[in-house]
Structure formats: structure tokens, C-alpha cells
């Protein structure tokens, strides 16, 4: 499966930058998750701690981190936003960022 990370207009990969900023143990888990998805595709998502946020917007939770994503089809997944998990629910402004980034790619989450 192809993973498409959200990048700024200047080409800055915000997802990889976030993973790089994590402590070693959490960073390793983030990379392991990426590798599982790349190799096993949609089946890998069943083994991960995922939950639906809104429409087609989902999140992967690991340690105290979230990666929000949209599954485009069986071959593409868009990682839209990564952040620290602050509360039990995804905070509204974090959701809004992911929704805006989905729109930047022309993806509908509804």
C-alpha cells in the first residue's frame, strides 16, 4: 500500500517531521506502523489501534500519539495529521486540521 504523507506547499513532510520529534521508543513504533501498512496494506489496520473519527477520517493511536488518515482505496492511504493525544477524544482543532488537509488533496471525508 502507498502511504501519502501530508506535505506543505514548500514540500515539508509534516508527518515524518512529527515522527522524528518523538522519543526513540515512540518513533520506532511509528515507523513499525508505517512498515506494517506498506507491506500488509489494509489488513494491517485491523491489527492496529484504530478508530473512526468522522466519515472517512480515521485515526491510528500509539502510545500518546495519533495519526489521522483517510483510506483512499485498497492501494492508497493519506496520513493527514499527527499529534499528541491530549484527551480521550480527538480535540476539535486537531480534527479541523485533518479535515482541511483532506480537502487540500481533494478528498471528501463525508
List where the protein language model places each region.
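Basic, Lys/Arg-enriched alpha-helical interface segments
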Residues: 1-64, 74-76, 84-110
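Short, surface-exposed beta-strand/loop micro-motifs that present aromatic residues
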Residues: 67-70
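Conserved catalytic cores of phosphodiester-cleaving nucleases, focusing on short active-site segments
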Residues: 80
Amino acid at each position: 500500500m502507498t502511504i501519502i504523507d501530508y506535505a506543505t506547499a514548500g514540500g515539508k513532510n509534516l508527518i515524518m517531521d512529527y515522527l522524528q520529534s518523538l522519543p526513540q521508543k515512540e518513533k520506532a513504533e511509528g515507523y513499525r506502523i508505517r512498515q506494517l501498512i506498506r507491506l500488509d496494506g489494509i489488513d494491517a489496520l485491523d491489527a492496529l489501534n484504530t478508530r473512526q473519527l468522522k466519515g472517512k477520517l480515521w485515526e491510528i493511536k500509539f502510545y500518546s500519539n495519533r495519526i489521522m488518515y483517510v483510506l483512499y482505496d485498497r492501494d492508497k492511504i493519506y496520513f493527514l495529521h499527527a499529534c499528541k493525544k491530549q484527551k480521550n477524544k480527538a480535540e476539535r482543532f486537531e480534527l479541523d486540521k485533518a479535515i482541511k488537509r483532506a480537502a487540500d488533496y481533494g478528498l471528501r471525508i463525508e
